[in-house]
Structure formats: structure tokens, C-alpha cells
From Swiss-Prot:
Record-annotated disulphide pairs: C311-C391, C351-C375, C353-C358, C407-C436, C418-C431, C420-C426, C430-C453, C444-C450, C449-C475, C462-C482, C469-C500, C493-C505, C512-C562, C527-C573, C540-C550, C557-C599, C593-C605
Native source organism of the sequence: Trimeresurus stejnegeri (Chinese green tree viper)
Reported modifications of this chain: The N-terminus is blocked.
Residues where Pyrrolidone carboxylic acid is found: Q192
Quaternary organization: Homodimer; disulfide-linked.
GO molecular function, one term: metal ion binding
Pfam families, per the entry: ADAM_CR, Disintegrin, Pep_M12B_propep, Reprolysin
Protein's name in the database: Zinc metalloproteinase-disintegrin-like TSV-DM
Residues where Ca(2+) 2 binds: D470, M471, D473, D484, R485
Glycan attachment points: N219, N502
Length: 621
């Protein structure tokens, strides 16, 4: 029986506040000294982990008692996490270190709804927590045979450089052919709505340059700790816009740099992105990579990234300067640049986020919060709707979680029926919090077909139809799950403008609207004849990077041609063509190309049955 391990730490406050001390975070004035005393109560037969999965800390801040709740960040590392560094003679060394029992936590202050915390417990307690709107830092005091820690406000750290740091992004460093246009809920196609509702995961890779290696004393352990501390905060920030950041790997250029890292940010970013595409992507699958550098960029720039380039093999990249001793300020810069990768530009003066400064403010200040502004959230949503980047949809499996299952962490994991938290916090009458199994007599604890611990009756509607290709989903009476059903693939839809495929109706009209806005339409047939040329944009498919011209019967399965009804555009044959993402703007597989025919994945207009039985994964139902 797995039980929650609750650890209580009592912190006794030293009877005086220090006036000045030099810590890892810098020269600190006005700090409190605390002594953690760990009290552990393990259930009988439980195995002691090196780092517990759930902990509490009791301490006084400004003389007032607070309780800090912490849970291990189980999403920090991917299952295939790896590290690469180089020997003194330049030999590449790649390892897969054990990261299951890691020491990085997130949490909050009890009775403070807006509080956050990011703490490492590797060697004492190091990190920060937000209390009543103010940021506090905690780190061990380096005293012999002492467990003393310092707690202090960020404002009490002496600043080495008073000049504010800024992001180098102006408008866009990767020129997209078209601006992001606002999309209302009613204008969304079924595909866009489904994409928007799906959970998002960024498989993140981090590279540290040679200056970083030298800066941290040529000590790989010290440098990797710095990186883990930073990414743990990045995870916490991006979670605010429902993006999970999983660290899939890191590379430390311990021998020499793989590119010429220089003080001109735009040049360094371009060189890093080129190296990433040519080298890194061939050895490690990931969705986005950043370079963390110890070089000082020209001017106040702290980072730079390509805007809206997530998942792009060339441009899904960013660079960040390790500009401050306090890792959470570096993490804010990194999260900011990752926000650019995810389609978010800088906040304007009218943008708000219930804090003095939001994540996407152009200037990184000591008041920076972990909140995204209303503008950022809207811009990110519009980017997702318009571009639907696919690499962030790949959700890790339950078996990919690197930490062992823990009853009481609110995640239903392998071997558990339910998980409602600890016995003290559980409010679920269906779930036994001591073993994460259903209570006696209960059939279920959650699910669209679960009501008061019992399965809903067979035939009960659990999800209405979302489109004409969808069907109302019904409970079976034997499960809490609401199984997704949809109309037969190949059934005509949208007034015979398309054929159903797995609950959606892919049509050229919807694809034009997604590319050019709500008033767009499909071009005349004559425009599609350009696909017979087999040039850089007009083709049906590629074979070994050679573009194959469309046969006459297949011209509507190549590049999509649309009418953009905006007053300034008189061109009857508009396309979207991006040299770095050539598949964008092609007619999607499954789209109707003639009566009774649909495009397959090879750019051929074939019979409906053949299209849905081709290698695209379509299946006739």
C-alpha cells in the first residue's frame, strides 16, 4: 500500500536579522537566519526516498508564521533525458543519468492563493517563494557544521548592474509571410477547436556554451545544478498558459564552442539555429532548443528568439544570457524567449496581468512576475489556432514519468484507481486517499460517465456532437469513460464540399479561412494549374527533396490557392509558401478534390475509399 510521505520541517528563527552577507545570490542586506529541523514520519514498511515526494516547511517570515507546501516536479524530465559533454581532447560523451529521485520542487504558501514557490532541496533549501505579492529567496549559509539558512527579499540584494535587461526581439526575427489575425470562437473549424483543447508539451533542449563551463569553475555538477534550478522555474512559468516544459536533454560545450558565440545576439542566434538543425536534431528529438551563454551581449539585451517558430526545424530556437546570479531572473528571461517561440510578442502599455510587470514585458525588472498578460494569452491562442504546431501535441505516456507513482499527489498514475490528495486534504467520497483505490461499493471516482461513485446508465449522453461529422457520445453503463464516436469516414459533409474523417470535415474552404481569415474562399480551378509546374511552390509531393509536379487529375492535392477578400488584395490566386516550412499551405490529406474523391498523403486525388485506406492512417468505418 502506497502512502503519502508528509515531511514537516520546523524552522527556528535566529534571534537577530543580519545586516549584510555575501551569498550565492550576491551581497545581501537585511536577512533572517533560520535553522531547518526535519521531522519525518514514515508509514510502517515504507521505503525512505532520498528526496521525498511531498514536504511541508513551517517558518517565520517577518516574524509571522507561514507554511510552505512543496511537491516534487514530476514533469521536469522526460524519460529519455540525456546529457552530453566533451572530454579535454574533444571526445563526445553522452550519458543518461538517473533523474527519478531528483530534488526539484514546486509549491505554494498555505492560505495565499497567489503564492508560488520553486525550491531545490539538493543541498539544503535553495530557491524562492512568493508571499503576499513579494518575492523571498532562501539559500543555505555556508557555515561549517551548521544547517543555517538565509531568508531575504530580492530587493535586499545589491545590484551589480543597475541597467535594466531587455529582450532583443523587435517585431519578428523570423519573417512569417502573414500576420496573426484574430479568430473568434464561432469561426473555429472543428480541427482548430480540437487542437486548442488538447494539452501541450514542449520537449525542451538546453545547450550551455564554453563560457558557461568556465564561469562555473569547469564543474559539470555545478553547471547542471544551475540549469536544473533555472528550468524548474521555466516549467512553473509556462504552466500558466497550459504549456508543460519537459527537459529532454542538455549539452555542455566543455571542450570548445560548436559555433562562434559572439556579443551580437542576432548573429549568435542565427549560428545556433543553423547548428541545431544540422547537428543537434539528428542526434536528439526535441521541439525547441535554447543556448544559455555566459557572454555579455551588446547593450542591454538578455535574450533573443525567433517569433512563432516552435516546431520549425530551423527556427525553433532561442538564446539567453546568464545575466544574473539569481537563477529565477535568468529563468524569467528564458521563459520570455520561449514565449516568443510560442507566438507571443512583447506586451504593449495597455496589457495587464495583475502585477507590476508581466512575463512578456520588453524589459526584465526586479518586479517581474510569473503572469502572462491578457494580450499574451490572446496572442498565444491566435497563434495556436492559426498554425497548430504539431510537435507540442505529443503527450508523454504515464510510463514516461520518471518519478515512481505516488499516492496523494493528485495525479492518477499506473496502479491507481484515483488520487484525491492526502488524507487531510481529500474531499472525494469515492476515493480512499490512503491507497488511491476506490472505496468499497464505488465503481468510479471521476469521468464523464461517473455520477456519485457509480457508472451512469447505458445510453446517457455524455458529450454532444460538435459537428455534422461527429456523433453524440453515450455512456455504456460499464465504464466511467465517455468514448468518442463519429460519423462514418467518407460520408459527405458541408453541403457535399467535403467528406468526414474521424469526426471532422476537412475542406479547402476551411483551410483557406484558417490561412487568410474568415472571408477567404477557394480560388478558381485555373489557379491550381500552377501545381503542374513542379517549381519551388507548385507541386504535389516531394521525393528525396525533389518536388514532383502534379498530374492533371491531381492538381487540387498540391498547393492550396485561395481568394483573399481584403480590399488591398486583388490577386485571385493567393498561396502560403514558407521556404522553411514548405508543407504549410499544402492541401491537407483527406480533403475533397472531386466528387467521390479525396487527397491521399502522396498528393493524389483518389476514390474516397482508397484515400481512407491509404498509408495516411485513414480507415473506412
Amino acid at each position: 500500500m502506497i502512502q503519502v510521505l508528509l515531511v514537516t520541517i520546523c524552522l527556528a528563527v535566529f534571534p537577530y536579522q543580519g545586516s549584510s552577507i555575501i551569498l550565492e545570490s550576491g551581497n545581501v542586506n537585511d536577512y533572517e537566519v533560520v535553522y531547518p529541523r526535519k521531522v519525518t514520519s514514515l508509514p510502517k514498511g515504507a521505503v525512505q526516498q532520498k528526496y521525498e515526494d511531498a514536504m511541508q516547511y513551517e517558518l517565520k517570515v517577518n516574524g509571522e508564521p507561514v507554511v510552505l507546501h512543496l511537491e516534487k516536479n514530476k514533469g521536469l524530465f522526460s524519460k529519455d533525458y540525456s546529457e552530453t559533454h566533451y572530454s579535454p581532447d574533444g571526445r563526445k560523451i553522452t550519458t543518461k543519468p538517473p533523474v527519478k529521485d531528483h530534488c526539484y520542487y514546486h509549491g505554494h504558501i498555505q492560505n495565499d492563493a497567489d503564492s508560488t514557490a520553486s525550491i531545490s532541496a539538493c543541498n539544503g533549501l535553495k530557491g524562492h517563494f512568493k508571499l503576499q505579492g513579494e518575492m523571498y529567496l532562501i539559500e543555505p549559509l555556508k557555515l561549517p557544521d551548521s544547517e543555517a539558512h538565509a531568508v531575504f527579499k530580492y530587493e535586499n540584494v545589491e545590484k551589480e548592474d543597475e541597467a535594466p535587461k531587455m529582450c532583443g526581439v523587435t517585431e519578428t526575427n523570423w519573417e512569417s509571410d502573414e500576420p496573426i489575425k484574430e479568430a473568434s470562437q464561432s469561426n473555429l473549424t472543428p480541427e482548430q477547436q480540437s487542437y486548442l483543447n488538447a494539452p501541450k508539451y514542449v520537449k525542451f533542449f538546453l545547450v550551455a556554451d564554453h563560457i558557461m563551463y568556465l564561469k562555473y569553475g569547469r564543474n559539470l555538477t555545478t553547471l547542471r545544478t544551475r540549469i536544473f534550478d533555472t528550468v524548474n522555474v521555466v516549467y512553473l512559468i509556462l504552466l500558466r498558459i497550459n504549456i508543460h516544459v519537459l527537459l529532454v536533454g542538455m549539452e555542455i560545450w566543455s571542450h570548445k564552442d560548436k559555433i562562434i558565440v559572439q556579443s551580437v545576439p542576432a548573429v549568435t542566434l542565427k549560428l545556433f539555429a543553423t547548428w541545431r538543425e544540422a547537428d543537434l536534431l539528428k542526434h536528439k528529438s526535441h521541439g525547441c532548443a535554447h543556448l544559455l551563454t555566459g557572454i555579455n551581449f551588446n547593450g542591454p539585451t538578455a535574450g533573443l528568439a525567433y517569433l512563432g517558430a516552435i516546431c520549425n526545424p530551423m527556427y525553433s530556437a532561442g538564446i539567453v544570457q546568464d545575466h544574473n546570479k539569481i537563477h529565477h531572473l535568468v529563468a524569467i528571461a528564458m521563459a520570455h524567449e520561449l514565449g516568443h517561440n510560442l507566438g507571443i510578442n512583447h506586451d504593449k502599455d495597455t496589457c495587464t496581468c495583475r502585477a507590476k510587470a508581466c512575463v512578456m514585458a520588453g524589459t526584465i525588472s526586479c518586479d517581474a512576475s510569473y503572469l502572462f498578460s491578457d494580450c499574451s494569452r490572446q496572442e498565444h491562442r491566435e497563434f495556436l489556432i492559426k498554425n497548430m504546431p504539431q510537435c507540442i501535441l505529443k503527450k508523454p505516456l504515464k510510463t514516461d514519468v520518471v518519478s515512481p507513482p505516488v499516492c496523494g499527489n493528485y495525479f492518477v498514475e499506473v496502479g491507481e484507481d484515483c488520487d484525491c490528495g492526502s488524507p487531510a486534504t481529500c474531499r472525494d467520497s469515492c476515493c480512499n486517499p490512503t491507497n488511491c483505490k476506490l472505496r468499497q461499493g464505488a465503481q468510479c471516482a471521476e469521468g464523464l460517465c461517473c455520477d456519485q461513485c457509480r457508472f451512469k446508465g447505458a445510453g446517457t449522453e455524455c458529450r454532444p456532437a460538435s459537428s455534422e461529422c461527429d456523433m453524440a457520445d453515450l455512456c455504456t453503463g460499464r465504464s466511467a469513460e465517455c468514448t468518442d464516436r463519429f460519423q462514418r469516414n467518407g460520408q459527405p459533409c458541408q453541403n457535399n464540399n467535403g467528406y468526414c474523417y474521424n469526426g471532422t470535415c476537412p475542406s479547402m474552404t476551411d483551410q483557406c479561412i484558417a490561412l487568410f481569415g474568415p472571408n477567404a474562399a477557394v480560388s478558381q480551378d485555373a489557379c491550381f494549374q500552377f501545381n503542374r509546374e513542379g517549381n519551388h511552390y507548385g507541386y504535389c509531393r516531394k521525393e528525396q527533396n525533389t518536388k514532383i509536379a502534379c498530374e492533371p487529375e491531381n492538381v487540387k492535392c498540391g498547393r492550396l490557392y485561395c481568394i483573399d477578400s481584403s480590399p488591398a488584395n486583388k490577386n485571385p490566386c493567393n498561396i502560403v509558401y514558407l521556404p522553411n516550412d514548405e508543407e504549410k499551405g499544402m492541401v491537407l490529406a483527406g480533403t475533397k478534390c472531386a466528387d467521390g474523391r479525396a487527397c491521399n498523403s502522396n498528393g493524389q486525388c483518389v476514390g474516397v475509399n482508397g484515400a481512407y485506406k491509404s498509408t495516411t492512417g485513414f480507415s473506412q468505418i
